[in-house]
């Protein structure tokens, strides 16, 4: 079994990565492989609602959306991580997920999913809610934890200091593993 995780931060080794890594390492202890897919900082287009993607994938082939979709279709579960900007998921993450789910959302039905939000302080709950809506409309069961799936940290490395947040990530991984093994 394998879980594909999306790092929605432009910072490849920032706090969002660290939260996802914590989930992944616990998954590994549960006997489940994982991969962290980095969106990166390259330009990313918004969905234009052309509808052509339902036939051949997203018509924009100059970024990572179609690559992610191919990997996501092979994965057994998905975890999406976002940094929080102005009490909301990053615009890059939303544009990316809009295109992923518009073009391929039905392919993910019955795969468990989870979202992780990382912020200095506020906005994580609102971001968590927005991210989980992608799962809800795509017939995907949502994995939770012992608290909302969030971690606090502003500058890279601060997430390490959020003991409760890191424990929440490990608990999330255990719950996701349980769902995958059912």
Model-derived segments and their meaning:
Residues 1-103, 155-182:
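N-terminal beta1-alpha1-beta2 submodule of the flavodoxin-like/Rossmannoid cofactor-binding fold
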